[in-house]
Every structure is written in C-alpha cells, then in structure tokens.
Amino acid sequence: AMPGLEADLGISKTSLGIFLTLNGVVYGLSRFVNGILADRMNARWYMAVGLALCALANFAFGFGEDVSYWITGQHDGSQFTNTMILFMGIMWVINGLLQGTGFPPCARLLTHWIPPTQLATKMSVWNTSHSIGAGLVVILCGYIMGTLGMNVSADPDAVAAMAANLGVQPGDAAGMERVMAAAAHAGAWKWCFWIPSAISFAGAVGLVVFL
C-alpha cells in the first residue's frame, strides 16, 4: 500500500516511516498495559473486541482522503494533505494500540487449555501462525495493488499530479513508467486496508461465536 500512498497522495517516505515507528512503540507499550488488563477481564471477549476495533481502525485508514475533505472542504493543497496525514497518523497509532490486545489474552487462554507437556509445541505453532498470516497479507496486498483501483492513466492532470508526488520529471522515461503503472491502479491502496480489515472483523465475530 505504501507505493500507492506515495503516488496518489504525496505522503513522503519520511511520514510513512514516522507512522511505522510510532506504531511499533505504541504496540510495545500496549502489549504491556493490555497484559495487566487481560488478566482481570474475560479473555475471549477482550481479544474479540480488541480485534474488531483494530479492524475498524484499519478500515477507517482507507477513508483518509474523504475525512480530510469533510474537515477542510478541499481536495488538494497543504491544508488538505496535512489534515489527511494527521488523521492517518492517528489511525495508525490507534491500530498499534489495539493490536496490543491480541497477545496477552491469547497467551492466557493457551496456558489454560493446553497441558504443560504440550505447551511449548502448541505455542510454537501459534507463534508461527503470526508469520504465516503476515506473509499472506503481503501476497494479498501485492495482488490488490496490481489488479484493483481505477485506471486514470488517460487523465493528464492525474498523471501530472502523480508525477509531482513521486518527484518524477516529464523527461524521465523510467520514472514516467513508474508513474503510469501507479496511474493504472489509482486508489488500490485503500483496498489493502479494507479487505484485510473485513477478514479481521469476520475473525473477531468468529471468536465470539466459536471460541
């Protein structure tokens, strides 16, 4: 999704790097705080509600452009861009905060369900599932970025705006090839948040129903 955010919206790699850094810091602190809270609450509901709220925060991220327009009444310009970046940054931090509700209740439930003689093996399988899930999301998002979105490559204004966002000059053949590739799937980055969010929300419902 990051190349799409950069091409469509002009969000710099620096801003994206700040988002990721804040997300990581907040996530680490959240796991500590949520570990204390999860010991005092219903673990199943705690995990399900946390996952559902995390999915909603991710879903909201895809509406960054719309929220910025609702607030500023503008479709472009520095005020529009800054408001959008602020909203997305807040959503990303909230996402990190809510992600921290996953590990503590899982660890608590697993130690209750699994006998000590099997705990290390089952915990290893559980930990591996995180990496497998992350890998599948990367594949899914790669597919989304290459197939979804709106083709605006025939719109000279849209192409010029993307070229400016990416810092590509009209005479740069290699750079313009990158711009045209992005223009063929404008807005696809939104689906990189919406589709995984829908899957996560369905998982949260499944936790309540089947766990």
Over which residues does each language-model region extend?
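Helix-to-loop junctions at the C-terminal end of transmembrane segments
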Residues: 30-42
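Cytoplasmic helix-loop-helix junction between adjacent transmembrane helices
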Residues: 91-128
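Symmetry-related core transmembrane helices of the 12-TM Major Facilitator Superfamily/SLC fold
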Residues: 190-209
